[in-house]
């Protein structure tokens, strides 16, 4: 059974990943490798279909594969020309507030707001819905992100 603690952990990992990508980009480090790891370890690409609809995507609204998801975060591979690199905007913190959860044996849903802290210390509020699946190693991976 997926627990609240499992959801808290995967959400913390997701937020920490966004901050790590932003920090590496700001410091001239290999942010693309960090972003690749972020998508590889937190999304279910390669395991099942992933329903990813990034908030700021308007032309290429849906990201059904790994490369299109990576493009949204770092805009490094020219997969989706509209992308500007959401994760390289300098975010210094990400926090989640779940409105509600649905927990199952090998799946879970979470809906709420997450708050991205800008370099100036302002918070940007965005709504989310994540769907998760447990893989064969017991990892909780996102298969829905809208």
Label each region the model flagged.
Residues 100-137:
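Exposed beta-sheet edge and beta->alpha loop/turn motif
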Residues 19, 23, 44-47:
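Sec-exported extracytoplasmic/periplasmic mature domains
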Residues 22-26, 119:
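Short, flexible helix-adjacent loops and helix caps
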């Amino acid at each position: 059974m997926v627990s609240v603690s499992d959801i808290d952990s995967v959400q913390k990992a997701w937020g920490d990943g966004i901050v790590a990508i932003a920090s590496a980009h700001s410091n001239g480090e290999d942010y693309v490798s960090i972003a690749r790891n972020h998508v590889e370890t937190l999304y279910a690409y390669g395991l099942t279909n992933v329903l990813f609809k990034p908030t700021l995507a308007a032309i290429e609204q849906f990201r059904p594969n790994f490369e299109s998801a990576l493009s949204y975060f770092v805009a490094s591979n020219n997969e989706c020309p509209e992308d500007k690199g959401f994760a390289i905007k300098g975010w210094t913190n990400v926090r989640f507030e779940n409105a509600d959860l649905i927990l199952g044996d090998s799946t879970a849903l979470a809906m709420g707001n997450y708050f991205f802290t800008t370099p100036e210390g302002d918070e940007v509020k965005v709504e989310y819905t994540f769907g998760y699946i447990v893989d064969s190693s017991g990892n909780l991976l996102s298969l829905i992100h809208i």
